[in-house]
């Protein structure tokens, strides 16, 4: 290259071109690409006046105008990319000039929309102010109970007749479209309204559309003339009916969350009851259990009214010695029947307290746990059980493997943030096995913890409700623990839950038997139905293949009618759930959670339906490590099989599109869209199965807590603790950090009005941020440290409200990215022969995408006079 340039060009130009060539090579360009880049540069110098100020502005704004083209590393077809992007820039610049008045009108519409949102936000307060003085006039207290029931009956009857007409009235396509447009308009009007009225309105609209869809499916969409189409259609209809039942029951369950608040305890402590704290353990490491015991020792409750018990089903001498050392009770069984339930029932024979609080051995209670929960027991004598959330300070496999910890609500947030609160409204709160208090008298009446199923907790609460006792739920986290360490452990835990809930459905069905109210029966039914989602989810993941591979019409209707019924059903359900559940479950994430579990919970739930006594209790492992990032090929095998099946459907769909009957084109397109959506969801499931590296034994907790450090020379510096673990802390010194790595300092933390000192060593100094490692602590110091950190009353309270607002379209985009990420991981960890194919496909897709024009960055102003862009800026 240099010899040729010296022969053709004058020395200064040749030297400059040689420098450019070497620069291209240093940035990774191939010799051919670098030489071709130099050639395009020469042509640009010849054809365009690059020294003109206009071209200089383009050159200076190259990164903004051509964000997908790396000028320092040219590719052979970059001129084509420059040309396509330049034409795109000219088009959007011209469109902007041509439609400027229209954009201004859009701005005015946006302003009107903002005013509408502001008006909606203030509507409840204005209504309250205008109606306060009319409250007495509107009272119906003068009416008899019979008159009230009559009025209510008339309203309900009229509403049911109207709903029946709306659901069953047949429409032609145009009428159906207008009807849906009206409902959609109402939904958009009310969705911004704060308060529960808008949620109720959205539920009514969603139920109207969904019930109408189900009616249409049963009456108009089954092909009775083709056996294959009929069978496939009935299978899909079964799955859709299941989803519709869960949707209706779910709306009922959370229509009016109670949001129970604490009740103050009597000022006279002599009136406070005695409480036993049970910490059952089987094979967990002692280090996992220690923090729970240390925190329990610091619970704010009279010491003569509090007894702490370690229930060791492993019979380990180290646990016995630890219990004796810290002054708590220890119980070990000689036999181990009925697992955790049997362990607790055995301890009930020894404990004599009026109440029993139960914590899993990794759940660390806060100091305020009993003061927050016990007031309700003294107020309501029929209250048998108070449940609080299961909060985790460590990411579960979904959060860790996807990097979504504290960015997206986790799988359990919906249940503990909303569903249990909704259950509380209907007096149907479930006992969840930990972080709960139970009154001994009713527990003894039902024979202790239920042992007939592997979900002994929910079965116990069902028995208490059958006896006429009540339950309660408080949505304020009062304990925190460890999540499952791996996806396989997580799935194993969910399999046990699913099997247990189906066992209850078979052995003690809440729909039958005495003692339950209708609302309680429905709440329990929905909880059990939730774990039957495996088979319906697998049906949804394979349903479009029935048409693409077997030519079976699973929905026997024109594609236009399918769109007019299916899309509104899905959109209204998504919009309503986003409004109700947005703080606790972002849109489309349920698809990922259910897909990951579907294959694994389908067989055990089916077996439990047939033989409810089959199956055993499995202990969920906690406190493990993941030393290297890897794909769990065993877990991901079903997802990959479903991916291949859907790819086969894509191939069949492409063939049908080009060679099938013309009147099936729209049906093929709809089926392919469904398949591509399934592929995205399955890609997300694959992404979850890639276990991220986790080698930290002491899990860090983010927090903002005041503290101070004291040097050995007596100098004291205030600081803020921004994270802590059982082995150290991260702090930010308020001012310049005057400490050195390796230096020993004392950390000062407060609990209430008392200050505690902990010996530490500086292990890292970055500006004013300092990493501290705890020096060996005495037992007393360790107890104090846990109570100053993990057991603080305010440590977990704000976590559940820190998630961003759900935005369905943004959430859908996240799911799309997640799906592609899963396929990238397959390429990364696949065997070499498969990896070559993946890399080739990825490179081909990336090469095609590189020609797609991009919108310029905001800092690049496109001037009308600059419409002729340079093909090269060198």
Label every model-predicted segment.
Residues 2-271, 523, 533-537, 660-689, ...:
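N-terminal membrane-anchoring/stem segments of glycan-assembly enzymes
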Residues 312-319, 335-336:
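A conserved acidic beta->alpha catalytic loop
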Residues 8, 12-16, 629-874:
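Structured alpha-helical
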Residues 253, 331-355, 367-454, 465-466, ...:
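Long helical/loop segments within the catalytic core of UDP-sugar-dependent glycosyltransferases
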């Amino acid at each position: 290259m240099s010899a040729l340039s010296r022969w053709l060009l004058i020395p200064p130009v040749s030297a400059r071109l040689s420098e450019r060539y070497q620069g291209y090579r240093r940035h990774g360009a191939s010799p051919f690409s670098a030489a071709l880049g130099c050639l395009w540069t020469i042509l640009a110098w010849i054809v365009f006046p690059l020294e003109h100020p206009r071209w200089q502005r383009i050159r200076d704004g190259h990164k903004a105008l051509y964000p997908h083209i790396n000028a320092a590393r040219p590719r052979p077809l970059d001129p084509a990319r420059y040309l396509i992007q330049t034409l795109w820039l000219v088009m959007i610049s011209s469109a902007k000039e041509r439609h400027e008045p229209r954009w201004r009108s859009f701005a005015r519409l946006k302003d009107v929309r903002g005013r509408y949102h502001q008006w909606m936000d203030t509507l409840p307060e204005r209504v309250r102010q205008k109606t306060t003085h009319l409250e007495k006039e509107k009272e119906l207290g003068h009416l008899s109970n019979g008159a009230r029931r009559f009025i209510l009956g008339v309203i309900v009857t009229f509403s049911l007749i109207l709903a029946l007409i709306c659901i069953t009235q047949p429409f032609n396509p145009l009428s159906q479209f207008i009807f849906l447009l009206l409902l959609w308009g109402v939904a958009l009007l009310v969705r911004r309204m704060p308060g529960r009225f808008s949620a109720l309105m959205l539920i009514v609209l969603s139920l109207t559309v969904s019930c109408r869809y189900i009616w249409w499916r049963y009456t108009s969409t089954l092909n009775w003339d083709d056996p294959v189409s009929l069978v496939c259609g009935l299978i899909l209809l079964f799955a859709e009916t299941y989803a519709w039942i869960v949707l209706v029951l779910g709306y009922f369950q959370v229509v009016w969350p109670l949001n129970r608040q604490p009740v103050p305890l009597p000022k006279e402590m002599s009136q406070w009851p005695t409480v036993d704290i049970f910490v059952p353990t089987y094979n967990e490491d002692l280090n996992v259990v220690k923090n729970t015991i240390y925190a329990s020792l610091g619970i704010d409750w009279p010491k003569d009214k509090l007894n702490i018990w370690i229930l060791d089903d492993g019979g380990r001498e180290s646990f016995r010695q630890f219990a004796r050392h810290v002054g708590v009770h220890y119980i070990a069984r000689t036999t181990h029947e009925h697992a955790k339930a049997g362990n607790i029932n055995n301890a009930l024979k020894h404990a004599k307290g009026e109440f029993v609080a139960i914590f899993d051995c990794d759940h660390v209670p806060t100091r305020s746990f009993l003061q927050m929960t016990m007031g309700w027991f003294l107020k309501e004598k029929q209250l048998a059980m108070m449940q609080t959330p299961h909060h985790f300070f460590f990411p579960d496999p979904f959060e860790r493997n996807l990097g979504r910890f504290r960015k997206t609500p986790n799988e359990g947030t919906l249940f503990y943030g909303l569903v249990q609160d909704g259950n509380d409204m209907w007096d149907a709160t479930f006992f969840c096995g930990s972080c709960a208090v139970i009154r001994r008298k009713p527990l003894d009446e039902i024979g202790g913890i239920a042992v007939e199923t592997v979900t002994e907790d929910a079965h116990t609460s069902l028995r208490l409700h059958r006896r006429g006792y009540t339950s309660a739920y408080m949505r304020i986290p009062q304990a925190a623990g460890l999540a499952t360490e791996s996806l396989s452990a997580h799935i194993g835990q969910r399999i046990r839950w699913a099997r247990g809930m189906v066992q209850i459905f078979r052995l003690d069905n809440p729909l039958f038997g005495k003692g339950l109210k209708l609302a309680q029966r429905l709440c329990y039914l929905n909880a059990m139905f939730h774990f039957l989602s495996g088979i319906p989810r697998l049906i949804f993941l394979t349903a479009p293949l029935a048409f693409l591979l077997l030519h079976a019409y699973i929905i026997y209707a024109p594609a236009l009618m399918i769109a007019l019924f299916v899309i509104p059903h899905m959109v209204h359900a998504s919009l309503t759930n986003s409004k109700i559940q947005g703080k606790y479950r972002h849109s489309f994430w349920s698809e990922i959670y259910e897909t990951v579990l579907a294959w694994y919970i389908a067989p055990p739930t089916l077996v439990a339906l047939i033989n409810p006594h089959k199956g055993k209790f499995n202990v969920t492992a906690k406190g493990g490590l993941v030393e290297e990032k890897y794909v769990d090929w065993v877990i991901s095998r079903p997802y990959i099989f479903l991916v291949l099946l859907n790819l086969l459907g894509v191939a069949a769909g492409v063939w049908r599109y080009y060679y099938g009957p013309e009147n099936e084109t729209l049906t093929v397109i709809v089926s392919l869209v469904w398949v591509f959506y399934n592929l995205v969801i399955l890609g997300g499931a694959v992404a979850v199965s890639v276990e991220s590296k986790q080698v930290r034994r002491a899990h860090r907790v983010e927090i903002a807590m005041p503290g101070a450090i004291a040097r050995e020379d007596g100098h004291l510096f205030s600081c803020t603790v921004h994270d802590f673990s059982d082995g150290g802390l991260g702090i930010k010194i308020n001012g310049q950090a005057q400490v050195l790595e390796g230096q020993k300092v004392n950390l000062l933390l407060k609990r209430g009005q008392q200050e505690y000192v902990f010996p530490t060593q500086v292990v890292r100094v970055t500006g004013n941020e300092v990493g501290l490692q705890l020096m060996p602590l005495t037992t007393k110091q360790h107890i104090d440290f846990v109570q100053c950190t993990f057991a603080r009353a305010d440590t977990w309270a704000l976590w559940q409200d820190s998630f961003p607002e759900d935005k369905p379209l943004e959430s859908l985009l996240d799911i799309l990215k997640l799906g592609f990420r899963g396929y990238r991981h397959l390429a990364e960890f696949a065997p070499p022969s498969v990896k070559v194919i993946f890399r080739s496909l990825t490179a081909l897709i990336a090469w095609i995408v590189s020609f797609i024009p991009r919108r310029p960055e905001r800092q690049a102003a496109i001037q009308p006079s600059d419409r002729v862009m340079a093909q090269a800026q060198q």
